[in-house]
From Swiss-Prot:
It comes from the Bacteria. This is 2',3'-cyclic-nucleotide 2'-phosphodiesterase. The lineage of its organism: Bacteria, Bacillati, Bacillota, Bacilli, Bacillales. Pfam families: YmdB. The keyword Iron applies. Belongs to the YmdB-like family.
Amino acid sequence: MRILFIGDVVGSPGRDMVKEYVPKLKTKYKPHFTIINGENAAHGKGLTEKIYHSLIQSGADAITMGNHTWDKKEIFDFIDDVPNLVRPANFPEGTPGKGITYVKANGKELAVINLQGRTFLPPLDDPFLKADELIAEAAKRTPYIFIDFHAEATSEKLALGWYTDGRASAVVGTHTHVQTADNRILPKGTAYITDVGMTGPYDGILGMDRETIIKRFKTNLPVRFTVAEGKTTLSGVVIDIDDQTKKAVKIERILINDDHMFFE
Protein backbone atom coordinates (compact mmCIF):
# COMPACT_ATOMS: atom_id res chain seq x y z
CA MET A 1 0.00 0.00 0.00
CA ARG A 2 1.15 3.50 -0.75
CA ILE A 3 -0.13 6.60 1.09
CA LEU A 4 0.35 10.22 0.04
CA PHE A 5 -0.05 12.74 2.86
CA ILE A 6 -0.08 16.52 2.36
CA GLY A 7 0.82 18.73 5.35
CA ASP A 8 -1.27 21.59 6.78
CA VAL A 9 -2.92 23.48 3.91
CA VAL A 10 -2.87 27.22 4.70
CA GLY A 11 -5.45 29.46 3.04
CA SER A 12 -6.04 29.92 -0.67
CA PRO A 13 -2.29 29.74 -1.51
CA GLY A 14 -2.21 26.27 0.01
CA ARG A 15 -5.40 25.22 -1.75
CA ASP A 16 -3.97 26.42 -5.06
CA MET A 17 -0.86 24.29 -4.50
CA VAL A 18 -3.04 21.28 -3.70
CA LYS A 19 -5.10 21.82 -6.83
CA GLU A 20 -2.00 22.14 -9.01
CA TYR A 21 0.30 19.51 -7.55
CA VAL A 22 -1.75 16.75 -5.94
CA PRO A 23 -2.88 15.41 -9.34
CA LYS A 24 0.75 15.49 -10.50
CA LEU A 25 1.93 13.76 -7.33
CA LYS A 26 -0.75 11.10 -7.73
CA THR A 27 0.39 10.51 -11.31
CA LYS A 28 4.03 10.26 -10.22
CA TYR A 29 3.66 8.16 -7.07
CA LYS A 30 0.37 6.33 -7.76
CA PRO A 31 -0.78 6.22 -4.13
CA HIS A 32 -3.67 4.03 -3.10
CA PHE A 33 -4.83 6.78 -0.72
CA THR A 34 -4.29 10.53 -0.40
CA ILE A 35 -4.80 12.30 2.92
CA ILE A 36 -4.67 16.07 3.46
CA ASN A 37 -4.54 18.07 6.69
CA GLY A 38 -7.08 20.85 6.17
CA GLU A 39 -7.28 22.58 9.55
CA ASN A 40 -5.81 25.85 8.21
CA ALA A 41 -7.42 25.71 4.77
CA ALA A 42 -10.01 28.48 5.28
CA HIS A 43 -8.20 31.84 5.59
CA GLY A 44 -5.52 30.17 7.71
CA LYS A 45 -7.80 28.87 10.45
CA GLY A 46 -10.49 26.22 10.18
CA LEU A 47 -12.42 24.64 7.33
CA THR A 48 -15.63 25.44 5.45
CA GLU A 49 -17.87 22.94 3.69
CA LYS A 50 -17.05 24.44 0.30
CA ILE A 51 -13.34 24.09 0.95
CA TYR A 52 -13.80 20.55 2.27
CA HIS A 53 -15.36 19.56 -1.04
CA SER A 54 -12.69 21.40 -3.02
CA LEU A 55 -9.96 19.39 -1.28
CA ILE A 56 -11.84 16.18 -2.00
CA GLN A 57 -12.18 17.21 -5.65
CA SER A 58 -8.45 17.94 -5.73
CA GLY A 59 -7.77 14.32 -4.84
CA ALA A 60 -8.10 13.82 -1.08
CA ASP A 61 -9.61 10.57 0.17
CA ALA A 62 -9.66 11.85 3.76
CA ILE A 63 -9.08 15.18 5.49
CA THR A 64 -7.60 15.52 8.97
CA MET A 65 -7.84 18.50 11.31
CA GLY A 66 -6.28 19.88 14.52
CA ASN A 67 -6.55 22.67 17.08
CA HIS A 68 -8.28 25.02 14.60
CA THR A 69 -11.09 22.55 13.90
CA TRP A 70 -13.80 24.81 15.33
CA ASP A 71 -12.54 28.23 14.16
CA LYS A 72 -15.07 28.41 11.31
CA LYS A 73 -18.37 27.94 13.10
CA GLU A 74 -20.14 26.56 10.05
CA ILE A 75 -18.25 23.32 10.62
CA PHE A 76 -20.87 22.45 13.21
CA ASP A 77 -23.40 22.38 10.36
CA PHE A 78 -21.60 19.79 8.24
CA ILE A 79 -19.00 17.86 10.24
CA ASP A 80 -21.45 15.04 10.99
CA ASP A 81 -22.65 14.84 7.39
CA VAL A 82 -19.43 14.45 5.39
CA PRO A 83 -17.90 10.97 5.36
CA ASN A 84 -14.15 11.42 5.36
CA LEU A 85 -13.42 14.36 7.65
CA VAL A 86 -11.76 13.53 10.97
CA ARG A 87 -11.10 15.89 13.87
CA PRO A 88 -8.86 15.03 16.84
CA ALA A 89 -10.29 11.90 18.41
CA ASN A 90 -9.31 12.93 21.93
CA PHE A 91 -11.85 15.73 22.15
CA PRO A 92 -14.29 14.91 24.98
CA GLU A 93 -17.09 12.40 24.54
CA GLY A 94 -20.07 13.93 22.74
CA THR A 95 -18.04 16.34 20.60
CA PRO A 96 -19.44 16.61 17.04
CA GLY A 97 -17.64 14.73 14.30
CA LYS A 98 -15.41 11.69 14.56
CA GLY A 99 -11.75 10.94 15.16
CA ILE A 100 -11.42 7.90 12.90
CA THR A 101 -12.61 7.06 9.42
CA TYR A 102 -12.04 4.23 6.97
CA VAL A 103 -11.27 4.66 3.29
CA LYS A 104 -11.33 1.87 0.71
CA ALA A 105 -9.74 1.37 -2.71
CA ASN A 106 -8.73 -1.61 -4.83
CA GLY A 107 -9.71 -4.10 -2.16
CA LYS A 108 -7.68 -2.35 0.54
CA GLU A 109 -8.97 -0.46 3.58
CA LEU A 110 -7.07 2.20 5.53
CA ALA A 111 -8.02 3.51 8.97
CA VAL A 112 -7.28 7.23 9.34
CA ILE A 113 -6.97 8.51 12.92
CA ASN A 114 -6.51 12.13 14.02
CA LEU A 115 -5.10 12.94 17.47
CA GLN A 116 -4.05 16.20 19.12
CA GLY A 117 -1.21 16.72 21.56
CA ARG A 118 -1.56 18.34 24.99
CA THR A 119 1.83 20.03 25.40
CA PHE A 120 1.61 23.81 24.73
CA LEU A 121 -1.93 23.29 23.37
CA PRO A 122 -5.36 23.41 25.03
CA PRO A 123 -5.78 20.31 27.21
CA LEU A 124 -7.76 17.44 25.73
CA ASP A 125 -8.19 13.80 26.72
CA ASP A 126 -5.06 11.64 26.77
CA PRO A 127 -3.97 10.99 23.15
CA PHE A 128 -2.02 7.89 24.17
CA LEU A 129 -5.04 6.20 25.73
CA LYS A 130 -7.19 7.27 22.79
CA ALA A 131 -4.59 5.80 20.42
CA ASP A 132 -4.82 2.48 22.30
CA GLU A 133 -8.59 2.51 21.97
CA LEU A 134 -8.77 3.39 18.28
CA ILE A 135 -5.90 1.16 17.17
CA ALA A 136 -7.63 -1.79 18.86
CA GLU A 137 -10.89 -0.82 17.16
CA ALA A 138 -9.30 -0.37 13.74
CA ALA A 139 -7.25 -3.58 13.92
CA LYS A 140 -10.48 -5.58 13.91
CA ARG A 141 -11.12 -4.27 10.37
CA THR A 142 -7.74 -3.59 8.79
CA PRO A 143 -4.00 -3.91 9.46
CA TYR A 144 -3.39 -0.53 7.78
CA ILE A 145 -3.62 2.27 10.35
CA PHE A 146 -2.54 5.87 9.71
CA ILE A 147 -2.26 8.49 12.49
CA ASP A 148 -1.99 12.26 11.99
CA PHE A 149 -0.75 13.52 15.36
CA HIS A 150 -1.36 17.27 15.48
CA ALA A 151 0.98 18.44 18.23
CA GLU A 152 3.39 21.20 19.21
CA ALA A 153 6.13 19.37 21.11
CA THR A 154 8.66 17.21 19.30
CA SER A 155 9.02 15.04 22.40
CA GLU A 156 5.30 14.30 22.54
CA LYS A 157 5.24 13.35 18.86
CA LEU A 158 8.27 11.10 19.25
CA ALA A 159 6.71 9.51 22.31
CA LEU A 160 3.52 8.62 20.45
CA GLY A 161 5.53 7.28 17.52
CA TRP A 162 7.52 4.95 19.75
CA TYR A 163 4.44 4.07 21.81
CA THR A 164 2.53 2.88 18.74
CA ASP A 165 5.50 1.33 16.90
CA GLY A 166 4.37 -1.96 15.40
CA ARG A 167 0.69 -1.17 15.99
CA ALA A 168 0.22 1.79 13.64
CA SER A 169 1.40 1.73 10.03
CA ALA A 170 2.39 5.39 10.19
CA VAL A 171 2.52 8.26 12.66
CA VAL A 172 3.04 11.64 11.02
CA GLY A 173 3.27 14.91 12.91
CA THR A 174 1.50 18.10 11.88
CA HIS A 175 0.92 21.58 13.35
CA THR A 176 4.34 23.26 13.48
CA HIS A 177 4.39 23.95 9.70
CA VAL A 178 8.14 23.28 9.28
CA GLN A 179 9.13 19.98 7.69
CA THR A 180 11.56 17.95 9.77
CA ALA A 181 14.29 15.70 8.36
CA ASP A 182 13.80 12.77 10.75
CA ASN A 183 11.62 10.56 8.57
CA ARG A 184 12.38 6.93 9.40
CA ILE A 185 10.98 3.46 9.87
CA LEU A 186 10.87 2.57 13.56
CA PRO A 187 12.16 -0.89 14.61
CA LYS A 188 8.77 -2.63 14.65
CA GLY A 189 7.66 -1.22 11.30
CA THR A 190 5.94 2.12 11.86
CA ALA A 191 6.74 5.00 9.49
CA TYR A 192 7.43 8.20 11.43
CA ILE A 193 8.16 11.89 10.90
CA THR A 194 7.96 14.62 13.55
CA ASP A 195 6.39 17.18 11.21
CA VAL A 196 5.38 16.93 7.57
CA GLY A 197 5.41 20.71 7.13
CA MET A 198 2.85 23.06 5.59
CA THR A 199 1.37 23.73 2.18
CA GLY A 200 0.84 27.43 1.49
CA PRO A 201 2.81 30.70 1.55
CA TYR A 202 6.57 30.18 1.36
CA ASP A 203 7.81 33.64 2.32
CA GLY A 204 5.54 34.18 5.32
CA ILE A 205 6.05 32.97 8.88
CA LEU A 206 4.30 29.61 9.25
CA GLY A 207 2.03 30.77 6.43
CA MET A 208 1.10 34.11 7.98
CA ASP A 209 2.11 37.62 6.85
CA ARG A 210 5.63 38.05 8.18
CA GLU A 211 5.45 41.78 8.96
CA THR A 212 2.45 41.16 11.19
CA ILE A 213 4.23 38.37 13.05
CA ILE A 214 7.41 40.43 13.46
CA LYS A 215 5.34 43.30 14.85
CA ARG A 216 3.78 40.93 17.37
CA PHE A 217 7.20 39.78 18.56
CA LYS A 218 8.56 43.33 18.76
CA THR A 219 5.61 44.97 20.52
CA ASN A 220 3.84 42.08 22.28
CA LEU A 221 0.59 43.75 21.18
CA PRO A 222 -2.34 41.84 19.68
CA VAL A 223 -2.37 41.78 15.88
CA ARG A 224 -4.69 40.41 13.24
CA PHE A 225 -3.08 37.41 11.57
CA THR A 226 -3.50 37.29 7.80
CA VAL A 227 -2.37 34.67 5.31
CA ALA A 228 0.80 35.72 3.51
CA GLU A 229 0.90 36.35 -0.22
CA GLY A 230 3.54 35.59 -2.84
CA LYS A 231 5.60 32.44 -3.32
CA THR A 232 4.15 29.10 -2.27
CA THR A 233 5.31 25.71 -1.04
CA LEU A 234 3.93 22.19 -0.70
CA SER A 235 5.06 19.70 1.94
CA GLY A 236 4.16 16.05 2.17
CA VAL A 237 5.30 12.46 2.54
CA VAL A 238 4.84 9.23 0.63
CA ILE A 239 4.66 6.07 2.73
CA ASP A 240 5.00 2.50 1.48
CA ILE A 241 3.59 -0.41 3.50
CA ASP A 242 4.45 -4.00 2.64
CA ASP A 243 1.25 -5.90 1.88
CA GLN A 244 2.73 -9.17 3.15
CA THR A 245 4.22 -8.09 6.47
CA LYS A 246 1.88 -5.08 6.91
CA LYS A 247 4.90 -3.07 8.06
CA ALA A 248 6.05 0.25 6.62
CA VAL A 249 9.17 -0.04 4.48
CA LYS A 250 9.68 3.53 3.27
CA ILE A 251 8.75 7.13 4.10
CA GLU A 252 9.89 9.77 1.62
CA ARG A 253 9.63 13.51 2.15
CA ILE A 254 8.13 15.79 -0.52
CA LEU A 255 8.97 19.49 -0.64
CA ILE A 256 8.01 21.68 -3.60
CA ASN A 257 8.90 25.38 -3.82
CA ASP A 258 11.30 27.74 -5.58
CA ASP A 259 14.24 26.11 -3.79
CA HIS A 260 13.06 22.52 -4.26
CA MET A 261 11.77 21.90 -7.77
CA PHE A 262 9.24 19.23 -8.68
CA PHE A 263 10.20 16.72 -11.33
CA GLU A 264 7.37 14.69 -12.85
